[in-house]
Amino acid sequence: MMTDSAPPEPIHAEIPEGWLHKAKTLSEALPYMRRFAGLTIVIKYGGHAMGDPELAKTFARDVVLLKQVGMNPVVVHGGGPQIGRMLDTLRIQSTFIDGLRVTDAATVDVVEMVLAGSINKAIVTEINQAGGCAVGLSGKDGRLIQARKMVRKRHDPESNIERVLDLGFVGEPVVIDPHVLIQFRDSDIIPVIAPIGIGEAGETFNINADTAAGALAAQMKAARLLMLTDVKGVLDKDKQLIQELSVDRARLLKQEGTISGGMIPKVETCIDAVERGVEAAVIVDGRVPHAVLLEIFTPRGAGTLIRASR
């Protein structure tokens, strides 16, 4: 006697396709989790990624994930637009030389207040809200970033004299003392650092966030320095993304003029960090959601990777 039997149920009938895709993505990330477990990832955080509320939340979750899977993320943040708005509110005029904010005594107090106060604590709060345990620091804490006054010179073609430009309390790192950060390596703590340096006599110095991140990454021999920016990365002459560069190739592109404008100091920071022991530095498009995870956990990445010449 024949009986009708119900057709077999399709495999995964009750599992949404999106979940299967997420599971596959997690599985593919496993080799990268092993590769970077226990290693330091320094992230320079700024630009659109920091100014957009949704991207800020995404960034915080991504940093927490890095810590949860065994990496040691260190966040160094900027805050130029926020500083500018506060100076405008206080009616303190800003002047720039070669893209650097001239920082007098009144301005440096505002810079420290905005960077080490409001911005730093906002990032810490965002990371903690995402389930992490972030602690805010400035370069003054534990004498983490010891700095000196930056000296800039400019040649005057009319007089043929090289003039020294006074940038005020704009500094450059001379010593990075990472002992405070080393204490956090084997803990759940994620350090978030404002780029404020301390001088030999206790002065406060305003330090470019890219420069501070590069110096910290070099001192800690980080596996990666990620520089979040508002561009795709380094572009070739046809405006196409260059996914990877050697230090030598990066220097050549700079000489040829392919790397120009605001990209020059970022590439120079990456080159300096790599030559001082960072395994690779990456200029990452911070406008892309989950750009940090894409860079660490996928073969293609999310920007331009610069590594030592072979």
From Swiss-Prot:
Residues holding substrate: G79, G80, R101, N206
GO molecular function, one term: acetylglutamate kinase activity
Cell compartments where the protein resides: Cytoplasm
Alphabetical list of InterPro entries matching this protein: AceGlu_kinase-like_sf (IPR036393), AcgluKinase_fam (IPR004662), ArgB (IPR037528), Asp/Glu/Uridylate_kinase (IPR001048), Glu/AcGlu_kinase (IPR001057), NAGK-C (IPR041727)
GO cellular component: cytoplasm
Catalytic reactions of this protein: N-acetyl-L-glutamate + ATP = N-acetyl-L-glutamyl 5-phosphate + ADP
Site (Transition state stabilizer): K44, K266
Pathway: Amino-acid biosynthesis; L-arginine biosynthesis; N(2)-acetyl-L-ornithine from L-glutamate: step 2/4
Keywords, in A-Z order: Amino-acid biosynthesis, Arginine biosynthesis, ATP-binding, Cytoplasm, Kinase, Nucleotide-binding, Transferase
Alphabetized Gene3D superfamilies for the sequence: Acetylglutamate kinase-like (3.40.1160.10)
Enzyme Commission number(s) from the entry: 2.7.2.8
Main location: cytoplasm
CDD domains: AAK_NAGK-C
Biological processes per GO annotation: arginine biosynthetic process via ornithine; L-arginine biosynthetic process
Pfam families xref list: AA_kinase
Endpoints of the signal sequence: none
Record family assignment: Belongs to the acetylglutamate kinase family. ArgB subfamily.
PANTHER family per record: N-ACETYLGLUTAMATE SYNTHASE, N-ACETYLGLUTAMATE SYNTHASE, MITOCHONDRIAL
Protein's name in the database: Acetylglutamate kinase
Biological source species: Rhodospirillum rubrum (strain ATCC 11170 / ATH 1.1.1 / DSM 467 / LMG 4362 / NCIMB 8255 / S1)
Gene of this entry: argB
